[in-house]
Amino acid sequence: MVRLISILVGLGFVGVAAWSLLWGAITYVSEPHEETVEHRFHEHPKEASFSFNGPFGKYDRAQLQRGFQVYKEVCAACHGLTYVSFRNLEELGYSEAEVKAIADQWQIEVPSINPDTGEAATRKAIPADRFPSPYANEVAARAANNNALPPDLALITKARHDGPAYVYSLLTGYRQPPANLPAESRPGQGLYYNPYFPNLNLAMPPPLTADGQVTYADGTNPTVDQMAKDVSAFLAWTAEPRLENRNRTGIAVLIFLTIATILAYLAYKNIWGSVKERKVRIAGPLEPENIARSDAAKRDEGIAG
């Protein structure tokens, strides 16, 4: 009786769940969907070509160094790189001495403790330090940015769909709001229209405003488009510094699996090929041939059939 009740209760739960899913599907199909302003005016990231795209992609070290320069001169005043250390810059091609100089000259000092008084203090950065945040805490960050919180950029390309393309599109996507944008969706005071941002308006003013804003050490023409691509590539590296190793490992695994599959197939053909060609006939005691042999043996022994 208890088992029967349990089965009935379980069936009841299954029925309720099935009905809920069915009703939700019917409602989704039958009822018209109201198109939001964000859905109408939001644009998907632009197509952006980067050297690290695809399974054979590799980082362009020169581009990463240019991107770091853009970050240092334009972005670092508001955005941190919490998970990146100064010494990681050696992977971009900087020498140990250059990294030490970059850390020592960084405009934001590292929080520390005064060994004599035990009070909070700051000190010059060293290569082992991570990039310091420009703000002491979230409250200070919001107070300095009209209550908007500047995100940390170390993992920004992994936290956003289409990663580097999104960052590139956002940096180059500032424009005047279209005339048909509803009044309630227009940017208010301290906000800027950008169709690549999810809700269309963001508190960050255009960071890249003119060609030549940064002077590249390698002589590359620093257009707004070039600077946006370079810093997007740099932020892709901060989020995935081992991307090249992962690509190489993935290719090696695919090659290994391909060879292993071929060898397994050849072994299968070698072992089972002759077995499949062999004809197997199952003969029992009631087969006419076996009955005749049995009768002959009985006669030879003088046994009556």
PLM regions: where:
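Post-cleavage N-terminal segment of exported redox proteins
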Residues: 1-58, 264-282, 286
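Extended, hydrophilic extramembrane loops/domains of integral membrane proteins
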Residues: 197-198, 204-240
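Alpha-helical transmembrane segments
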Residues: 4-12, 231, 250-257
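Juxtamembrane interface at the cytosolic side of transmembrane helices
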Residues: 246-305
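The canonical Cys-X-X-Cys-His
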Residues: 71-82, 231, 235
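Electrostatic cytochrome c docking/interface patches
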Residues: 44-69, 80-94, 98-99, 219, ...
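Membrane-proximal low-complexity regions enriched in glycine and acidic/polar residues
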Residues: 107-202
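Acidic/histidine-rich catalytic neighborhood
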Residues: 54, 63, 84-85, 91-92, ...
